[in-house]
């Protein structure tokens, strides 16, 4: 039994060291754009991520089946969205927003989902929208309990950096039910303005 405990402790320690190394590398290579060996975290308009009609592999068990009919979702089905709840409310607001032409419930797998690099691999925001003015909006909804989580903060930093490198063609929104004294609809208005 002593060997099992030692092996478990070593496994936990190695995992912690791996996470620390990932965070350090991410900070150096991704979140420090001025350094000589930093990665470029900006949209590649020469090879953009394209949502192709008919290419949205939403597993049958994860498809939205609620009563609300989304009018602007790019695909006829939605994946990973439960009827009711905070993300559902966010999706409804995106769907009804006058600045949104089309939107997608982003898949959390490549190559069909849009992702950005993080210390733990890739981050797939909740929603991607094409706006009526031609800009691309990448939107991430967070529950209040996650707003101060270090990994979630890293995602926000990466998304913000990505949008800043877009020459105004893309925006990144970090949304919550209440944030900085604004409700969800108000936050969405500010982000999409």
PLM segments and residue spans:
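Intrinsically disordered, low-complexity, repeat-rich regions
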Residues: 1-121, 129-135, 142-193
């Amino acid at each position: 039994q002593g060997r099992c405990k030692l092996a478990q402790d070593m496994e936990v320690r190695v995992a912690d060291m791996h996470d620390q190394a990932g965070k350090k590398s991410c900070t150096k290579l991704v979140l420090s754009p001025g350094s000589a060996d930093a990665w470029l975290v900006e949209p590649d308009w020469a090879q953009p991520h394209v949502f192709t009609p008919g290419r949205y592999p939403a597993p049958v068990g994860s498809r939205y089946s609620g009563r609300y009919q989304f009018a602007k979702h790019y695909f006829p089905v939605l994946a990973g969205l439960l009827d009711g709840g905070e993300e559902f409310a966010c999706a409804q607001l995106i769907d009804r927003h006058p600045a949104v032409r089309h939107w997608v419930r982003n898949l959390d797998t490549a190559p069909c989902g849009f992702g950005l690099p993080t210390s733990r691999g890739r981050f797939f925001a909740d929603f991607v929208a094409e706006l009526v003015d031609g800009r691309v909006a990448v939107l991430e909804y967070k529950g209040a309990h996650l707003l101060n989580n270090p990994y979630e903060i890293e995602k926000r930093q990466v998304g913000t950096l990505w949008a800043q490198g877009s020459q105004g063609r893309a925006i990144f929104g970090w949304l919550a039910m209440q944030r900085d004294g604004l409700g969800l609809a108000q936050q969405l208005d500010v982000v999409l303005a």
